Swiss-Prot record:
It comes from Neurospora crassa (strain ATCC 24698 / 74-OR23-1A / CBS 708.71 / DSM 1257 / FGSC 987). Signal peptide: none annotated. It is found in: Cytoplasmic vesicle, Autophagosome membrane; Vacuole membrane. This is Autophagy-related protein 8. GO terms for cellular component: autophagosome membrane; cytoplasmic vesicle; fungal-type vacuole membrane.
Length: 121
């Protein structure tokens, strides 16, 4: 999936920003979170997050749910490289495995399981 953030910001600028963030906040992970294009779920109000390294994927999903004001009965799926990461995984390990060459971790979310693959631990 194409990232709007990548389209709007040149690579060198993104890389420099991610490096600056990692130097200043070594215990945080720079995350870009965007909605899957054709999903009918609400669009998030901000794309950029500084996530504590010890946060789990499940806790990050909770943050996203709150930001888009998603009711408890509605489903949300988050994807890293078009795969559902394990809920108990630490964001730091997801970052190390899937960070982009610009230094950001790109996460997409949807109201439906659009890709269908689960990552096995």
């Amino acid at each position: 999936m194409r990232s709007k953030f990548k389209d709007e910001h040149p690579f060198e600028k993104r890389k420099a920003e991610a490096e600056r963030i990692r130097q200043k906040y070594s215990d945080r992970i720079p995350v870009i979170c965007e909605k899957v294009e054709k999903s009918d779920i609400a669009t998030i109000d901000k794309k950029k997050y500084l996530v504590p390294a010890d946060l789990t994927v499940g806790q990050f999903v909770y943050v996203i749910r709150k930001r888009i004001k998603l009711s408890p009965e509605k489903a949300i799926f988050i994807f890293v490289d078009e795969v559902l990461p394990p809920t108990a995984a630490l964001m730091s390990s997801i970052y190390e495995e899937h960070k982009d060459e610009d230094g950001f971790l790109y996460i997409t979310y949807s109201g439906e399981n659009t890709f269908g693959d689960f990552e096995t631990a």
